[in-house]
Structure formats: C-alpha cells, structure tokens
Amino acid sequence: MIDRLIVAPPEFQIYRDEHGNRLPRPFGLPICLLFTYLCNTSAGYDLFRKPAFNTAMKTLLDSWGLYLTTKDSAKLLTDCEGGWFSEEALQEFESDSRGKFEETYVCPDPDAVNRGFSSWDAFFTREVQPNARPVEAPDDKSVIHNPCESYLHCIARDVKCHDLFWLKGNIYSLYDMLNRDHKLAKQFVGGTIYQGFLSPVDYHRWRSPVDGTIKKTEIVAGTYYAALPDAGAPEGNQYQAAGDLRGALKRSQTWLAMVAARALVYIEADNPDIGLVCFIAVGMVEVSTCEVTVKRGQKVSAGSELGMFHFGGSSFVLVFGPQACITFPEDVVLGKHVKLNSILARVHKA
C-alpha cells in the first residue's frame, strides 16, 4: 500500500461521519492515516522507535519527497474533489483569519487553477506575501516574534536538563531535546519553553524570532511515526469521543520534541536580556526534510528565513535561558491561531 502512496501526490480530504460531522483524521497525510491505530499500541511504540525502521522510513520519505518536486506531483493542484484548490480546501487555507490565499501567498500565476505552482513541493513551501505577515514592532528589541504560523501547544518554565519525558504530560528534557549536548543544554536549565503546532494548511517556512547571530545549526535523526500510547482522546475534545485512540501523535507533541527527526538553530540575540535562543523544528509524520537555510556566523533580523519543512504536519519549539524573563500576551492561548511574525512574547529586565 505504501508503495502506491509514494508515487502520487496526497489528496486533500476531510473525513466526515454519516451526520456530516468532521472526523479526527488528518487530511493530506495518508501514511499517518494508515498508521493511526498502530501508533497507539505498545507494539507500534517499539517498532516506530527502532533506528532501523526510521532509517528505512527516511529513505522512503526522501523518495516521496523527490517525487513531490516533479511536474507530475502537481496534478492534484486542482479545484476538483480531492484537489488542493477545491472549495473545501480553500476554506481550510483561509480559516482562522489566515486571509485569502492569493493575497497571503506568493503565487506564480494567481489566475491559474493551480496558481502556477510547478510541483506539489513548490506549493507546500510557498512563500508568504511581504505585506501579508509584516514583522510587528520591528524596532522593539524586547519583542520575541512568532517564528511559525501555528497554534500554541504548551508553555513550560523552569525546565530541567534531565527529566522523565517519556511520561505523559508536558515534561521536557533539555539534554534529549538538544541531541545530548550537555554543554549547550545546561545553558538553558531553569529557562522557558514555548511549543507550537503547525497545521498542514499553514505556512511551513521558519522565520527568526529575534535579531541576532546564528551560533550553530544541527540536523538530528529521529522518529517519524512514534507516539506515546495512551487511553485515547480526553473528555471535551471538539472532534473526538472520549477514548478514541486516534490522534496519539498529536497528543505526543511534547515527547516528540525529544525523539523526532528535527533541526536545531541556535541564535545569540542582539538583546543580552534575551541571550541564547534555540529554535527547534520538529518533524512529524510525513515530514521527510527539515531544511536549514542559514549558516553559523550569519546575522539575522527578526522575520529573516531560517529554513522550512518539506511536507506534512509539524511542530516547533523555542528554548530560552534562565536569564530571559519571558512573558506572553493574554491572547496567546490554546486553540488560537498565531500569525507569523506577530508578537509572541516579551523579555523584561530582571
């Protein structure tokens, strides 16, 4: 079945029950859908963490990623059912005040059905219009800007170098997040973490949250479909009945920051009250590539590109040291879509 999936572009599809209610199945992520129940089992937990499995899966996803750069991969960039410019798809792309597609994103040919994108990858990694997501308060150096169009997943304070991150709950272990680099991890002990989640319809390039200098970049090999098995969806979930076993990957986002394939970008902020910041791009499910586009020693401004995801759902983490007194606006809350380059937080003098 997977052999058939990786020689075709993903379809856009929202799944509904017999009453028309939306089901919690990921759209545009066919392998994730295939593994959705297996992820939430002890056997899946063991299998999907095995290095040999993830090496093989990376090879497969890289092959699919190569196909998604071809002209043939653009054949579902249509307005037909299952197409990424269908009426239902555009409603998703423009939901949560994201804005009209052609006004928000750079389209090579805005009047064409496929908007002029030459491949599915070109469509997925599309650029944002310069005026659609301006950097808010660019001259205020106390501001930390949102590096990815996303939703809040978690804010954690007083983070530890080592912690029991395999337990349920929002527990972070800096040593494991930062690829077991104890020297770097100890610089962030006692600091603050912000983690956000990107929808498949979000903008998937990363921008710098601050003015500063790139100190180090690193690509970390990891898992793609591993999740922490649980008892299913909690009470009060908008799309799932309590106990529905699907969605374990999304519920495991904190844990994935320690184990998933990811990219680390360390930035020394020009503002000493902020200090060293680590941006972590966390690959989830059909993400075969975290591409870093900056190099060590490079100067960046808030809003400068750091890199991008190629295909899939994804997450990101910002890690601040203990010297950074970080506060978040009242409107940064669970469930609210936070726009790229908007004010995510502020740092105050201790």
Swiss-Prot record:
GO molecular function per UniProt: phosphatidylserine decarboxylase activity
Keyword NADP: no
One Pfam family per UniProt: PSDC
Annotated metabolic or biological route of this protein: Secondary metabolite biosynthesis
EC nos: 4.1.1.-
Record keywords: Decarboxylase, Lyase
Biological processes per GO annotation: phosphatidylethanolamine biosynthetic process
Keyword field contains Lyase: yes
GO CC term, one of those recorded: mitochondrion
Domain of life: Eukaryota
Induction line: Expression is highly induced during artificial growth in symbiosis with Populus, which is close to its natural condition.
Its job: Decarboxylase; part of the gene cluster that mediates the biosynthesis of the psychoactive metabolites ibotenic acid and muscimol. The first committed step is glutamate hydroxylation by the 2-oxoglutarate-dependent dioxygenase iboH, and the last step is decarboxylation of ibotenic acid to muscimol by the decarboxylase iboD. The order of the intermediate reactions is somewhat ambiguous. IboA likely activates the carboxylic acid at position 5 to introduce an amide bond, and the flavin monooxygenase iboF generates the N-O bond. There are several options for the latter step.
Family matches, as PANTHER family: PHOSPHATIDYLSERINE DECARBOXYLASE, PHOSPHATIDYLSERINE DECARBOXYLASE FAMILY PROTEIN (AFU_ORTHOLOGUE AFUA_7G01730)
Name of the featured protein: Decarboxylase iboD
Organism of origin: Amanita muscaria (strain Koide BX008)
Gene from which this protein is expressed: iboD
